[in-house]
Amino acid sequence: MVKQLQEQEENDPVEKTKSLISALNYLSRDLLLPSHLYASVSSIYHASVSDLSPSPPLRGNSYTPNRGDLMSEFEDALLQQRLNYESGSRLAELKETRYKNRIHNRLSQLEGLPSNRGEDLQEKCLLELYGLKLQELQCRVRGEVSAEYWLRLNCADPERQLYDWGMMRLPRRMYGVGDSFVMEADDQFRNKRDAERLLRLEEEEKNLIETTQRKFFAEVLNAVREFQLQIQASHRRCKQRNDGVQAWHGKQRQRATRAEKLRIMALKSDDQEEYMKLAKESKNEKLTLFLEETNKIFVSLGAAVQRQKDAKLSENTKLLKGSESDLSDVDAPEDVLPAQDIEIIDSDNNDDSNDLLEGERQFNLAIHSIQEKVTKQPSLLQGGELRSYQLEGLQWMVSLYNNDYNGILADEMGLGKTIQTIALIAYLLESKDLHGPHLILAPKAVLPNWENEFALWAPSISAFLYDGSKEKRTEIRARIAGGKFNVLITHYDLIMRDKAFLKKIDWNYMIVDEGHRLKNHECALAKTLGTGYRIKRRLLLTGTPIQNSLQELWSLLNFLLPHIFNSIHNFEEWFNTPFAECGSASLTDEEELLIINRLHHVIRPFLLRRKKSEVEKFLPGKTQVILKCDMSAWQKLYYKQVTDVGRVGLHSGNGKSKSLQNLTMQLRKCCNHPYLFVGADYNMCKKPEIVRASGKFELLDRLLPKLKKAGHRILLFSQMTRLIDLLEIYLSLNDYMYLRLDGSTKTDQRGILLKQFNEPDSPYFMFLLSTRAGGLGLNLQTADTIIIFDSDWNPQMDQQAEDRAHRIGQKKEVRVFVLVSIGSIEEVILERAKQKMGIDAKVIQAGLFNTTSTAQDRREMLEEIMSKGTSSLGEDVPSEREINRLAARTEEEFWMFEQMDEERRKKENYKTRLMEEKEVPEWAYTSETQEDKTNAKNHFGSLTGKRKRKEAVYSDSLSDLQWMKAMESEDEDASKVSQKRKRTDTKTRMSNGSKAEAVLSESDEEKEEEEEERKEESGKESEEENEKPLHSWKTNKKKRSRYPVMTSSPNSRGKGSSKGSKRN
């Protein structure tokens, strides 16, 4: 029965179809068919030939197997051949069977192998046995994995599926066809499942992409980090290497800096041997070259000095003059000495490791070879006892005399150079039996001081003052004609004017006071003294030996030793060439100090300088205070007019203005007082206006009452004699007792004025002095306050003025007040003065070898001042309390000054103390026309560089020859000759149409001021003593005006003016 059912199922087409579909589902998933399904399918496709052969395919109803048709025969043959071949699946089964048989045979062989074989072979056989036993498991796993992979690859996208094989119910029966509800539910479920599967696959793909990207980016970041780490490690290595190199160089620099500091300390302490040792250790070729060159210079100088000494000892003057050509060979150091001497020096240098001090030793030994101790002062000195440093100065001058050399006594001002000189003359007279004659040259202002000092200290020495009128000088010449005198004292003008008489005398010593006047070797005075007089020895006295260039230093050395220092060019090359060859444009501090040190050693044997701080430790101190003040509206107006158009409004009644030249001087006049521009017809004796019109006068009006009440006495210095006239008016209006001394004061009156001011109970509160006439050689220790009304371009002039009070004999603290207008040209002058004062510690300025500071620089400085105009005037004006704090010496004085200011403010009802803009006179304003603008443009063309004009010469119009002829002739005064020459030159220039204008530089201004002072001194001698009073501002005849409030006698100006103010 079962067998019948099986046969029935096998013959049922529906069952066969189901079996085929199930087999197809398995095969689509690449799965193995179950055995019963495989048997069913095999029974369907692999029927026996016998079952199939009887039923060939029918070809219609009339089928005949042997019909003879060609096509029919071919089809039959093809069908017969197909039945003889095996199917693909059958071949696969046969192949699989063969593999299984082989595996089975191999397993049998491996299991039957004996166990006594080698271990390696036994291990291989066991591995192969285990692998063959796992073959079925391996095939099954591989089939499942392959099926899943194929399904994922081909069935992930529903659109790519030809048929939903996964929904086939493999072992189940199908539902009835036509059940729409079931089919729809099936479709919905299938769509949902497909959507979920697609979403899951998309999520997995997205995660895979993100994972891949993260992995890639992580690899990139890791590579970047690794690269950065490598770079950082490389940088660290480079930094460590660079730090090591910098540390090494830093140590080298520190070592070099320490060595340089040690060398500089050795230079400052003047330890030459230590410095030379350190210089050799440094191996600095530049320094070594300079030291070698300067050593050669010292060797040559020492040889020349010794040769000059030998020539003088032989007393063969002709031989000395004839050997000038030989002595000029000093310029070439190796040609000065004989060949034998050069060889000796070279061998010594080689033996002593190139001793760089040998030349300096020879130089010093050649000069001060004869030594003489001076332990006490000469008995001829009766006026007092010399101080220890003055005895040392006397011994130094005696050493110069014994060695037959000249020198410079350059002690600081106030240390008694005059007394030391008198002590030298007395010592020579007493110990050397040298009676003279000696010639003393000094500025005209200090001649009475020399006469008084001789009378006080050495009355037994016959000293004559050679000065005065022609008749008086003739009388003096008659008295000294027989040579019965020891000393003749005169000034610079007479040494040239009376040269015909004075050059006939053989002078033993010529002593030049204020010897810095000879810093220009081309001046008439230097030429006259160098060629026209017979002088055995020379001595220069100066408190300011500071020179600004090698040329000025050489001028002094040339005057002292003309046969040794005979060429300025070679002298400059000695110190310029070593550094020029090294190609260095600027010098280091050590090189600069070394040059200065070597120059010091050149001039040291011939120069002696001591400072007050070194020798006078108990001398009261000196304090300089800069008092800055504002300018009045009138001053600011004039200052603006000068800087804008170069002209100012005048009190002429017609509204005209005056064109100005020398703008630097005009700006300084604006800072001092506007009255310096007005004419003589203007009433200047108005007490409130003269104070309120000037900021400096307003400051003085507050300062002077305080100083007088505190018991101080004042020296006031100014460079303008017209300003001193205004100060006289102010002092007279305020009942201050004063004296006055300037270039026009006669020589005999100067001593009287000094004596009146220095008396113990002198009633005079103030002494008015011009900076250049009153700042030289005067002893005014009774004053303890100095007011510099307007600073000089040359700070040494102000220094000279300050030391009139700060000198030996001063018992009080000296306070110096420098008045400066805020924001004006005076601040520039003060700054330049500070720069120049920096030279004092070096003797020669730092810019010695770079002389680029020319007139062009000064012109640019003035151009900057002019362009700035009045923009900075009146800024940061100090308060009254600040001024009181600066002016007071003690706390009690300060509170006294404060109380006086408060009382003054209440009395004035707190009015403004300076003139305001509405109070400025209308005529002071200028109407700027087109012509004025054109003239102003042309006037400032030299400043802006648009026009080039000829520079006006403000020096003396006379040549040296004309000046000397004027000095020798008594018929005509030199000042008149100069004025005639100037008038002639002016006419010539006007006829040629030359109207050139120029702006003076600071050096031109200094020359002009010196010339004015010299003309004052020379012109005053020809004036009559009883002169009628004048009320004029003209300066070509007189340098000051006369006013009714003062007496008219010029000889008693100081007394008369003070007598007129004795009401207080």
UniProtKB/Swiss-Prot annotation:
Disruption phenotype: No visible phenotype under normal growth conditions, but double mutant plants chr12 and chr23 are embryonic lethal. Residues 924-955, 967-1064 are annotated as: Disordered. It catalyses: ATP + H2O = ADP + phosphate + H(+). Expressed in embryos, root apical meristem (RAM) and shoot apical meristem (SAM). One of its GO terms (biological process) is unidimensional cell growth. SUPFAM superfamilies: P-loop containing nucleoside triphosphate hydrolases. It is found in: Nucleus. Residues 398-563 form the Helicase ATP-binding domain. Residues 1048-1064 have a biased composition (Low complexity). Keywords: ATP-binding, Chromatin regulator, Developmental protein, Growth regulation, Helicase, Hydrolase, Nucleotide-binding, Nucleus. GO terms for cellular component: nucleus. A motif (DEAH box) lies at residues 513-516. The keyword Membrane does not apply. Residues 699-866 form the Helicase C-terminal domain. Its EC number is 3.6.4.12. The keyword Nucleus applies. GO terms for molecular function: ATP binding; ATP hydrolysis activity; chromatin DNA binding; helicase activity; histone binding. Belongs to the helicase family. This is Probable ATP-dependent DNA helicase CHR23. It comes from Arabidopsis thaliana (Mouse-ear cress). The lineage of its organism: Eukaryota, Viridiplantae, Streptophyta, Embryophyta, Tracheophyta. The gene is CHR23.
